[in-house]
UniProtKB/Swiss-Prot annotation:
ATP binds at G13, P14, T15, A16, S17, G18, K19, T20. Coiled coil: none annotated. It comes from Prochlorococcus marinus (strain SARG / CCMP1375 / SS120). The gene is miaA. This is tRNA dimethylallyltransferase. One of its GO terms (molecular function) is ATP binding. SUPFAM superfamilies: P-loop containing nucleoside triphosphate hydrolases. Monomer. Substrate binds at T15, A16, S17, G18, K19, T20. GO terms for biological process: tRNA modification.
Length: 299
């Protein structure tokens, strides 16, 4: 008799939708740990700007896939997938199911749909050369060698741009052509959280991040890794850098961060509706609805 397939529950949604709080409530009720699927929370020292679960929250419920690397040592999608699958395999032997929580669409897809990114190791010499050229030039080079990846990668996203170029110059093949799908042998339950007042939630959370010390956190990252750290170009940190340099006031930085976060949330919503098929939870009774759906699957 074959062993039943393990169950993996996913809670996905755009940034600031309330995933972390709901996930902790769910995890407490069904007695499982949480695997965070957030591309920036993988890095040490990036706590406030990424709204990483607090120490208190991590003490309440065990969290995995946090603080895997230093910010100056980018993790590839292949490395993340390997780490996450190994962690889930260990969880399946101890808990009733795996529980993935996050809003990083490509990272989620690598696990839930079995997206297999190329296993090309980091090429530090190439990366240094690409950084010397600058993001604008690199993105134009990408347009010529991998138009498909160029269309999908934001002109501001230096990490993914450099990775795509790294794969091309290392293998002679585009990162787009090397990605394949190998669905995992799991039963999957995807739950979605997308509150109607998301813009208000984003505005409120952005103010809180700055109040909690985002500028000091950014100063610490600059001190340790230098102001050219690519992750300092991401939402929140880039705006904090402008305050540190005296280019913008805190009020202006908060306003710009809010705008960029809203734009990002819009992209997340589009991705989730095209790439996933979750059961969208009613925001008024999301916990009860989630537990009911989970119970129907667990039995």
């Amino acid at each position: 008799m074959q062993n039943p397939k393990p169950l993996v529950i996913v809670l996905l949604g755009p940034t600031a939708s309330g995933k972390t709080d709901l996930a902790i409530q769910i995890a407490k009720k069904i007695k499982v740990s949480i695997h965070n699927i957030d591309s920036r929370q993988l890095y040490k020292g990036m706590n406030i700007g990424t709204a990483k679960p607090t120490i208190e929250q991590q003490e309440e419920i065990k969290h995995y896939l946090l603080d895997l690397k230093d910010p100056n040592n980018p993790i590839t999608l292949h490395e993340f997938k390997k780490e996450a699958e190994l962690s889930l395999k260990n969880i399946f032997s101890k808990e009733k199911c795996g529980f993935l929580v996050g809003g990083s669409g490509l990272y989620l897809k690598s696990l839930t749909s079995g997206l297999c990114p190329p296993s090309v190791p980091a090429q530090e010499k190439l990366r240094k050369e690409f950084r010397r050229l600058g993001q604008k030039e690199c993105h134009q080079i990408l347009k010529k060698c991998d138009p498909i990846a160029w269309e999908k990668i934001s002109p501001r996203d230096s990490i993914r741009t450099i990775r795509a170029l790294e794969v091309f110059y290392s293998t002679g093949q585009t990162i787009s052509s090397l990605k394949t799908l190998k669905p995992p042998d799991w039963n999957l339950l995807e739950l979605g959280l997308d509150p109607r007042n998301l813009q208000q939630r984003i505005a409120k959370r952005t103010k809180i991040l700055f109040q909690k010390g985002l500028i000091d956190e950014t100063k610490a990252l600059i001190h340790q890794y230098g102001e050219d750290l690519p992750l300092l170009q991401t939402i929140g940190y880039k705006e904090a850098c402008t305050v540190i340099k005296g280019e913008y006031s805190i009020t202006e930085a908060i306003e710009i961060t809010t705008q960029r976060t809203n734009q990002f949330a819009k992209k997340q919503r589009t991705w989730f509706r095209r790439q996933h098929n979750p059961k969208w939870l009613n925001e008024k009774n999301s916990l009860e609805e989630a537990l009911s759906l989970i119970q129907n699957v667990i039995g």
